Amino acid sequence: MVFEYPKGVELIAGVDEVGRGPLVGAVVTAAVILDPHQPILGLNDSKKLSEKKRLLLAEEIKQKALAWSLGRAEAEEIDQLNILHATMLAMKRAVENLKIQPHFVLVDGNRVPELMIPAQAIVKGDGLVAEISAASILAKVARDQEMAELDKRYPEYAFAQHKGYPTALHLAKLAELGPLAQHRRSFAPVRKLLNTL
């Protein structure tokens, strides 16, 4: 499947999120406007790239993009709003943080946040649209770095290994050590644990 860009639109921002599934930390989003005169080779869905390749591409994106920005919604906001609404809010923040206002926004997935700019959702857009691929890489690198920092503060939880996702290791550590302030209270494994304490 080949994506057809909107006709006659110059500044297109791609938007993606990372971190809807984890039990801990923020959902992180990115918005990127690429420079058509400085193409970046190797852009793809961040999940299909090695960590080393993601880091290299993230630096290249930051150097070559016309504009890029990050957005986020914290664990508390996720608990208050729910993960879908918090993700939409984080995407909106990423677009609003861009130093250049895009003419059109392409969003990975099947929903678009409320924006003052025309937008379109593209299912599996992170593998089809270069701008969304770039956004997915920046968001993934940023969130992974946050998990590495959390791992330094709380090495016993092994965040560097599972990145906050509900793996068997994370669930075992959660049961053994209890949740941190950064854990999402509204997510079932954390909620169940809090109800038994």
UniProtKB/Swiss-Prot annotation:
Q: Per the UniProt record, which EC number(s) apply here?
A: 3.1.26.4
Q: Does the keyword Hydrolase apply?
A: yes
Where can this protein be found?
A: Cytoplasm
Output the superkingdom of the source species: Bacteria
Task: List the Gene3D superfamilies.
Answer: Ribonuclease H-like superfamily/Ribonuclease H
Against InterPro entries, the record matches this protein to:
RNase_HII, RNase_HII/HIII, RNase_HII/HIII_dom, RNaseH-like_sf, RNaseH_sf
Main localization is: cytoplasm
Segments spanning the bilayer are: none
MF terms in GO: manganese ion binding; RNA binding; RNA-DNA hybrid ribonuclease activity
**Which UniProt keyword terms apply here?**
Cytoplasm, Endonuclease, Hydrolase, Manganese, Metal-binding, Nuclease
SUPFAM superfamilies annotated for this entry? Ribonuclease H-like
Named cofactor requirement(s): Mn(2+); Mg(2+)
- GO CC annotations, alphabetized: cytoplasm; ribonuclease H2 complex
One GO term under biological process is:
mismatch repair
* Every RNase H type-2 domain range: 10-197
* Known catalytic reactions: Endonucleolytic cleavage to 5'-phosphomonoester
Q: How is the cofactor bound?
A: Manganese or magnesium. Binds 1 divalent metal ion per monomer in the absence of substrate. May bind a second metal ion after substrate binding.
Per UniProt, a divalent metal cation binds at D16, E17, D108
What's the stated role of this polypeptide? Endonuclease that specifically degrades the RNA of RNA-DNA hybrids.
Provide the family line: Belongs to the RNase HII family.
> What's the protein called, per UniProt?
Ribonuclease HII
Q: What is the lineage of its organism?
A: Bacteria, Pseudomonadati, Pseudomonadota, Gammaproteobacteria, Pasteurellales
